[in-house]
Amino acid sequence: MSSFIRWYNSRLAARPLLTQSVTTAFLFATGDVTAQQLVEKRGAQKHDLVRTGRMALYGGFVFGPVATTWFAFLARRVNVRNNKKAEVLARVACDQLGFAPVMIGVFLSSMATMEGKSVKERIDKTWWPALKANWMVWPAVQVINFSLIPLQYRLFFANIIAIGWNSYLSWVNSQ
């Protein structure tokens, strides 16, 4: 395991955006597989590989690059002098009141578009319930993330937690 961590760290140092994006693609796909197999209990024969591919595509080409840039922006621009707790809370507020509502909309719109479905209908039906569910999970996760996790590992940490969240999003999106 330590050789994998050394290798991953070297990739993060050499190509941070690419490494974060590929990692995100893999973990978004993992979330969808989890949704299909553990939540929906589809079995291997009925597994929707195209759906898993859409999740990987979105994770790698949209969410990975955007979230990598977002975490760097927060670290660079949202700072409170001499008050780490206030800084963490400010970052969580920016994340949950700005980034999360937009990115849930981007996710649902992207999925609807890739599926050939109505974006408006998808947003109208699922955006608000998904955002409320987000607020039940992600503020606490982001407090931990912004308090304890070094910047280069924040997306990875969020993506590990997001396996469950992406399972939920994949399931909500498929309803």
UniProtKB/Swiss-Prot annotation:
The keyword Transmembrane applies. The keyword NADP does not apply. Keywords: Membrane, Mitochondrion, Mitochondrion inner membrane, Transmembrane, Transmembrane helix. InterPro entries: Mpv17_PMP22. GO terms for cellular component: mitochondrial inner membrane. Coiled coil: none annotated. It comes from the Eukaryota. It is found in: Mitochondrion inner membrane. The chain crosses the membrane at residues 55-75, 92-112, 143-163. It is a multi-pass membrane protein. Belongs to the peroxisomal membrane protein PXMP2/4 family. May be involved in cellular response to stress. Required to maintain mitochondrial DNA (mtDNA) integrity and stability. This is Protein SYM1. It comes from Gibberella zeae (strain ATCC MYA-4620 / CBS 123657 / FGSC 9075 / NRRL 31084 / PH-1). The gene is SYM1.
